């Protein structure tokens, strides 16, 4: 083992695509003989993971995990929905979501985290690729914090507990009763999952990207001018349409899907009276499987997934 350097382990990993721990073991089993180590990995069926990593991972699962005032949601892709139903894959995804709690949501950070088996998340996924026979990748992750308070979750059409095609986290910041907050948070998470009347882009008006708001304002103004309206009327029309726009995309302004007569903001105000403490939304995340990936030619999609998950 004395002749086995970190550089040699890295070289073997680069050639085979196998995790660092397995590469180190292969070199140890072959007394540091590089080519023999490659053959050893091939015989173990591990080096095939490198070729599989080039294949498209379009399916998979979105998983959520919460712990008091912290929560995380991750998307792990696989090639087929058949693998998404595989117990080993689901167990791995569940652990990855749990490991993401308390972090920043950075994919590279999560990949470097240690699993219960002692390997890193990245190496564990590489081993699963070889074991299950399909490419898979941790594509993205996000976290929500509400302290004091709770982070509630909801998974739409779950494939297993806390994982499915759409995962939502909602942080409710308050000193109120945690059980009541959790119940309210889950209902709001269900609202966010529904995306009605549109998928919310921010908690409040100030959180809407100024570029998006400016573009909408410009479009509304052009429409009014093309209708021959004078400038004094144009401005009033634009303001009215912007209010409608915010009612569609700002969470607090949206009509609550379970009680359309009240907005989310009004629901929170009522909850605050019931709890005897203010209730605010610290943040929310809605993650849908495959969202934001352009499904063009297969090689382009594979590149997008690889880029999003930090793979080279």
Curated annotation (Swiss-Prot):
Region entry Involved in Mg(2+) ion dislocation from EF-Tu, spans: 80-83
GO molecular function terms noted in the UniProt entry: translation elongation factor activity
Annotated keywords: Cytoplasm, Elongation factor, Protein biosynthesis
Places the protein is found: Cytoplasm
Membrane-spanning intervals of the chain: none
NCBIfam families tied to this protein: tsf
Family assignment from sequence similarity: Belongs to the EF-Ts family.
Protein name, as recorded: Elongation factor Ts
Gene: tsf
């Amino acid at each position: 083992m004395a002749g086995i350097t970190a550089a040699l382990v890295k070289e073997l990993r680069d050639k085979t695509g196998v995790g660092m721990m397995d590469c180190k073991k292969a070199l140890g089993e072959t007394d540091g003989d590089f080519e023999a180590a490659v053959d050893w990995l091939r015989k173990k069926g591990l080096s095939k993971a490198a070729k599989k990593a080039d294949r498209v991972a379009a399916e998979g699962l979105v998983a959520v995990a919460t712990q008091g005032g912290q929560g995380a949601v991750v998307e792990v892709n696989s090639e087929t929905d058949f693998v998404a139903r595989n117990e080993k894959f689901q167990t791995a995804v569940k652990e990855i979501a749990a490991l993401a709690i308390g972090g920043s949501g950075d994919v590279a950070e999560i990949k470097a985290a240690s699993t219960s088996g002692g390997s890193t998340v990245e190496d564990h996924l590489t081993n699963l690729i070889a074991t299950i026979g399909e490419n898979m990748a941790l594509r993205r992750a996000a976290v929500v914090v509400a302290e004091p308070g709770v982070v509630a979750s909801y998974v739409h059409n779950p494939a297993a507990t806390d994982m499915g095609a759409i995962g939502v986290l909602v942080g409710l910041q308050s000193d109120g009763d945690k059980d009541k907050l959790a119940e309210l948070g889950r209902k709001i998470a269900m609202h966010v999952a529904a995306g009605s009347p549109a998928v919310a882009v921010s908690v409040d008006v100030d959180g809407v990207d100024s570029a998006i708001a400016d573009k909408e304002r410009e479009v509304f103004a052009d429409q009014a001018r093309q209708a021959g309206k004078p400038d004094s009327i144009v401005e009033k029309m634009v303001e009215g349409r912007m209010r409608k726009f915010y009612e569609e995309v700002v969470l607090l302004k949206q009509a609550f899907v379970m009680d359309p007569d009240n907005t989310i903001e009004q629901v929170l105000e009522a909850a605050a009276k019931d709890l005897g403490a203010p209730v605010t939304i610290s943040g929310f995340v809605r993650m849908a499987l495959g969202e934001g990936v352009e499904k063009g030619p297969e090689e382009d999609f594979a590149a997008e997934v690889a880029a999003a998950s930090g793979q080279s």
